[in-house]
Amino acid sequence: RCDYNIINYCNKYFYDNKLIVYKEAKKDSMILVYNDKGKYVDSDKVSFVNLREIITIEGLINSDIANKFIITPFKNQANNLCEKYSKERCGTIHTFQGKGEKEVYFTTVLNNTSEGRKHLQGNHNLFTNELINVAVSRAKDKFVLVTDRNFFFENDKNVKNLIEYIEAYGEIIPDKTVCIFD
């Protein structure tokens, strides 16, 4: 069901190249939208929200939520997204287990703040292989990663692998959104 580049990422990192992929690759099927400027994450000690990444996603989808899922590991980010879009279109990774859509936007939320670093070092790190596999493989035609590239490149192997894969086989777009959090 997925574009070649999307399912090939999962095949390479999670299935030991045992999947047989029948779809052809499109260059724009995997996109990295990165911002390394704004260091804003709000936390209630249980979950996180990054309004800057929400604003970025708003600019990317232009209010057209049809055929799109917006996925995040964090409940607070999902709740904020659901206030803007329908609950059927936004949620945590677990929300979309077993579902698929043409486009998936994955907001990683964390950046180089003490809260972000603590989360990645803790026992409840939500960037496991299993969860990243679910997030990526929900996308049929396009997967868009909205993230702080440098932070994850330095602090999380699993997201770093995803970033490197997109940089090799997809498109890289610096986020040019003007935001009060920068």
Predicted regions and their residues:
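Conserved nucleotide-binding/hydrolysis micro-motifs of P-loop NTPases
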Residues: 1-4, 75-78, 96-97, 110-113, ...
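Hydrophobic, well-ordered secondary-structure elements that form the walls
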Residues: 6, 57, 70, 98, ...
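A short acidic (Asp/Glu
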Residues: 7-8, 76-84, 101, 155-157
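Helicase C-terminal subdomain and adjacent C-terminal extension
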Residues: 11-13, 21-30, 85-88, 113-182
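Conserved helicase/translocase motor-coupling segment
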Residues: 17-84, 89-90
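Active-site proximal loops enriched in glycine and acidic residues that flank catalytic Cys/His/Asp
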Residues: 34, 72-74, 92-94, 107-108, ...
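Structural motif
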Residues: 69-71, 105-107, 136, 144
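Conserved motor-coupling elements within RecA-like helicase/translocase cores
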Residues: 82, 90-104, 111-113
